[in-house]
Amino acid sequence: MPPTESPTTAIERLLRSGDAAGALRIADELIKQSRRSFPGWLSRGCANMNLGRLVDADVDIDTALKLSPTDPQASLLRGMIDQRLGRIDNAIKHLRRVSASSAPQSIEASNALAEVLWFAHRRDELAAFVAAGGAWLRDPRAALMIARVRASHDIDGAITDLQSIAARERSPILRRVAGFEAVGLLDKTARYREAFDLSVKLHADTTPPFDLEGMLAPVRQQHAQLASASAWPAPRVEAITGLAMVVGLPRSGTTLLEQMLDAHPSISGIGEYDGVDMLANDLVSTGRWPRAASSIARDDLLAMQSRYMSGARRLTREGATISFDKTLRAWRWLPAIAAVLPGTVCFQVARDPRDSAISTFLSYFHPINDGWTASLTSLRRVLEAERSILPSMLQSVGLAHECIVYEDLVEDPTGHATRCLNRLGLAMDARVLAPEANTRAVFTLSHEQVRRPINRTSIGRWKNYEFAFDSSWDALACAHDERRVIR
């Protein structure tokens, strides 16, 4: 930090440059100097949100608003965090207030409000908000919202608009989002080759190089240990209760299962909570995981457990006794979960690998965090790695679990729901069979699908793109078919 630069100026500079971790360090120093530092808590919340630590950001912004209840920047962040945590009504309340104000943040709040209305399927409200006009419509991002509204009555026109955004805008993220929305509409109108070709171009233009080998390294270590039949160390912390977790890859039916189980009054979906990422980072940062796991201090393991559970409970609906974490990272970190969170009940979900792959390839994923989604070849390698350790790893590390094949779940939702609830010690509740009636908002790529009754339409989707799959997929597909009970 230059000598003449104030802490808040330094934080703003670091956030603009993408160094959220550096901004967090300065914010922590401000709070260390005074627990009543509004700039410290506000900056900490912004940095944590940028780092994906939404529970920490949630606490930070709550604290900031207690210190300055009417601050527009804090209200903006409050609304954005609430959206990602599924608190839609609260998000809309905060964002509408800032959007309607004369504060400099009104443009950002208007774009965020439009995004909330879109994901919450409040399409009439979104159309009215766009029709009302305002300065925010001159922001480049507003073109995306206008195209989304147009898609409700003119799909071909919306495709043209979205493709234009993807081709001309300077922001790579905006190009990517608009482009993949165009892909979705092309797929919806059976223009499959166009959808595939546009996806190839978008991935090539907006996905930086990705370290696939680094991502798969811990999976290979686990596979080697499974092959050697070596036992994993017994947990050195007490088992927790009231936690269930998805184990699986994106686009495998995980959101459907979450919405089904969340409809049970005793279960609360907590979305893709970042707790497993933080737990894994904490373990790796000891320098002893996994080869010297037994030398990690028990107190450190307890602190990791407490941090995870505290965040999960904060996200859990009042009255529910079980938190359901739909993390998409757990499959790579099962030994870590068993070491820190013994007692977790896991639900492994697997879908036809070709359906999972094409659905992922045609969808927007974060280009840096999820760069492995940029080609069918890398998708196949990740699927092969996942299935090389699952479900065997769940048994090996001693985690209670159920294995669910997506196609069977769709064919027999009653039987599968009953099995899942029995594993959690709960009685069947008919509400779990109507996930489309669940009012909980979903901030995932499956937000539209789970608004419909359970159906078979996504089974065999890969056949529309059969030209993209060669014989290298045959072994994965055959192994999956052998797991199916209902055919």
Q: Which residues does each predicted region cover?
A:
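PAPS-dependent sulfotransferases, especially Golgi type II membrane carbohydrate sulfotransferases
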Residues: 127-130, 150, 156-165, 169-171, ...
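Phosphate-binding active sites in nucleotide-utilizing proteins
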Residues: 236-341, 345, 349-350
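Residue-level detector of the short coil/turn that links helix A to helix B
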Residues: 18, 52, 86, 121, ...
